[in-house]
Amino acid sequence: MIKHIWVDADSCPLKVRNHTVDYAAKKGITVYFVANKQIECQSKNPFNMIVTDTQKDSADNYIFEHTQSGTDLVITRDIVFADRLVSKGVPVINDRGTEFTKEIIKERLSERDFNLQLVQLGLSKPYHEGYDQKKFEKFANCLDRVIVKNL
C-alpha cells in the first residue's frame, strides 16, 4: 500500500506538484518534495519540503535512501534515477504519465543515448518537449492507476 509519494521536484511542473498534493490528501498519503532549493506549491493541503545540498544528484540520493518497496511511489523525469528505484522495487512514474518498468527504462535510455549522439555529431539539436493539458491528464490517470494498483 502506498503511504508516501516522493517527488523529484527540481524539474516537476507546478501543476503536477499541486495535483499530487491534492490527490494525496484525499487518499491519506504523505507527500515529500525533494530538491536542492525551495520549490513552490500552491495547494492548500499539507506536504513536506526537503531541501538537500547543491551537490549533483543530492535530491535523488536522498529519495533513494528514504524510499522502500511496498510503501513508496516516486515521481521523476530522471530515467537513470528511475532505473535505480525500479531495481529496488519502488514504483516510479514521470510527469507525462509513464509508469517506468525495466523494459521501458531500457528503451528510453537507448533513445536518449542515440539522440545525444546525434546532437554531439551536429546532426540534431537538443529538444525539450513542452508540457500541455494532454500530458497532465496522462499523468493524473497514471498516478491514480498506480495508487489503486498498489492498495
Spans of model-derived segments:
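Nuclease catalytic cores that cleave nucleic-acid phosphodiester bonds
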Residues: 2-151
